[in-house]
Each structure stands twice: as structure tokens, then as C-alpha cells.
Amino acid sequence: MMRILMTNYEFPPLGGGGGVASYQIAKALTERGHEVDVLTTRWRGLPSEEVVDGLRVYRVPVVGRGDLATASLISMLSFVPSGVAEGYRKLRNKRYDILNSHFAVPSGVTGVTLSRLFGIPHVLTIIGGDIYDPTRRLSPGNNSLLRSVVRRVLNSSGQIIAISQDIKNRAQQDLQCKTNIDVIHYGLTPPEFERRSRQELGIPEDEVVLISMGRLIKRKAIRDVLLALSRLEGSPFRLLIIGEGPEEERLRDLAKTLGLASRVDFMGAVWGESKFQYLAAADIFVLPSVHEGFGLVFLEAMHCGLPVIASTSGGQTEFLQDGETGFLVPVGAVEALADRILRLANDGRLRKQISEYNAQYVKRFDISAVAERYEALFADVIRRSRRTAGDTGPGSSALPAGGTHGS
């Protein structure tokens, strides 16, 4: 058994896919017999400590968090001292075998600091926006100070996991990362949910229903979806936008300007079973992001049998197949996006064919296989750390056999 302290400033119900994925990985590791504690952000009404599905979750206070979906700069900065202080208290009273941080900033700063203070090996999982986001002024590619901080976190970690080859390449090429990086794609925990009819969900029966899901930020390019739909004159469609974030008001205004207000529903943040009920009631999933580190939401949509329309930029291109799982379009190519939407909307047979394919294809991305690779990599890192320290101390014999891990 390994004792793992996982740090992620965003953990459900906070954040987006990166938080959900870290929860699924942590839960799968506990199901394999390991002990996982989670250090994350406290927000309105959430308890400072609780047990969730076998995980002990510790939440630390931050300043300036505005909503569930999106962290402010000040909330991210304040997570570091709060996280280090809470982690210090935990590590003084309990022996952990390994630290695993998700996102280079701010979680990785916390993890690297605790690793140095206590001599415990640190594995950093890099996600996407922490490495590359061309739409944000405050991102490693657009801010030299942040680039320096992220580079230092990368090169101070004992091992890195990238959620896609795309993110690995960007860390090595753009940020000069010298630490070993293994690629471990996200997986999916097949959700259990009771399907509901469109009538129960308040969705018209006689329209082709498109759904976009994610934080409402520029990088998700939901603006392009609205622009594409404005070109589909006379087509009976409805767009459900699930999520919240700083772009919501601008998107609402754009929908009105384009004459789409009556055909676009802003659903707000939807979680758990309800999220999958809306996905299962839709016909097409569309999210042409400027960039995705991986895109867990695409797996969720495919599990519900939806054809997926995405962009050609990011880690999603490592598993989405143009013409097989749906369509891939260049970033910002509104006309091409409108064409692919129309093609799927007008061809029920094609939608059914892709739906059946996706429901089977997504089974390859099982979370248990992801957890097995994390387990093997963690065990290998712990062994290397103990050899370096000349310590084969208590608990070393309990580590899983093996320790090999591919990329």
C-alpha cells in the first residue's frame, strides 16, 4: 500500500475536467488498496475536511474565488501559502510515500515546496492551461515571469505525467523541461445515471439538439459555435450551453445579436447525473476549443453516444478521429464548423453510425488502466528515491511489483 498526498487547487465541485479527472484517478487508486488524501481549495459551504468515496479531502481557504468554475489569479496565488501550511501540518503527523500535484501552478508550487521540506518524492501531472493557453494573457507562453515559475516547477519535480503527447511536447519544447515525462491519457469512470426524456428535461422533441459543455472561457471557443449556427438558416436546432464562467454575458449578448436567443439555452453549471442526462438527450456534441490538453468531456459525450465536433489543436486529436468519432475542424474555421454541424444535423443515419462507434470506442479509456499506470509509476519513483537516499525503510516491501511504465 502507498500513502499518497494529492494536491489540486481544483477538485469537485470546483473547476472543470482537470478536477474531475484527479478525483477519478484518486478514487481508482483507493480501490486498488492505496490511501489517498487530497489537498484542495475551500469554497462557500464546503467543509474543511471530509471523506468522499474513500478519499480524505482537506480544503484550505483562499482569497477571491468568484465561482465554482473559474479560479481568479488571487485565489490561485493564495492557494500556495495555504496549501503549504496545511500540507506541512499533515506531513508532520503522517508519513506519506509520495506527493502528486495536478497543474504546475499553483498546485505544483505547493507540491515542490513540500517535497523539499520533507524529502518526499514529487510527481507532477500537467494538464493543459498550466502549460499552454494562447487565449490568456497570463499564461506561460505570454508572460515571462509565469514561464520562469512553471519551468522551475517542472525541473524541480522528480517525475512528470502529461495527459497527452501534445502537452509533453509543449513542456519540452516551449518550457525546456528536462525532467522525465510519461504520457498517461485520462480515463473514464462509466457513470451510472437514469436516462430522462427530452420532455422531462424541457427540451423540444422536434429539434436537432447540440450541446457544448465546459467552462465559459475564451479558450473553449463557444463563440465560434454561435457564429456557425447563425449561418444555418432554416435548420431546426437547439444549442444547450452547460457551464459557467467569465464569458457568459458576452456569449449571451452575442446570441441576441445573432438572433439566436430563442434557440440557445444557457443551463449554468450542471454536475453528476444531470450532466449525463443532458448529454444522453442531445444529438451532437460540439466544442471547437482553441486548445485542449486532452478533453475529458469528449470521452463523456462519446460514452453517451454523441458524435463529437472538435478542433484540430490539442491532445484530443490523439483519440478523436475525423470522420470516425465525428469531425475535426481547424481553430477559428467557422464556415467549416457550420458545414460539419449541418452535415450531422441533416443525416440521422450518419449520427447513428457514429453514435454506435463512439459508445464502443470509448470503452478503451477505462479508469482502472489509468490507475494501474499511475500505481506502477509511483512505485518506481518511490524506489528510485529510496535508493538515492539509501533507505529501503518500512513499507518498501508493500510496494506493487514491477514499476515499469511506458510513454
Positions of the model-derived regions?
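Acidic anion/phosphate-binding donor-loop and adjacent secondary structure
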Residues: Q172, G187-L201, D206, S385
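A short, well-ordered alpha-helix in the C-terminal region of glycosyltransferases
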Residues: A336, R343, L350-R364, R373-A376
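Aromatic "clamp/platform" in nucleotide-sugar-dependent glycosyltransferases that forms part
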Residues: V290
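Conserved donor-binding/catalytic core segment of Leloir-type glycosyltransferases
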Residues: I161, P204-K220, L226-L229, L240
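Conserved acidic donor-binding segment of nucleotide-sugar-dependent glycosyltransferases
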Residues: D322-G323, F327-V334, R343-G348
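Carbohydrate-associated surface elements
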Residues: R42, D166, G187
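Nucleotide-sugar donor phosphate/pyrophosphate-binding loop at the beta->alpha transition
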Residues: F118-V123, I131-R152
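Short hydrophobic beta-strand element within catalytic cores of glycosyltransferases
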Residues: P307-A310
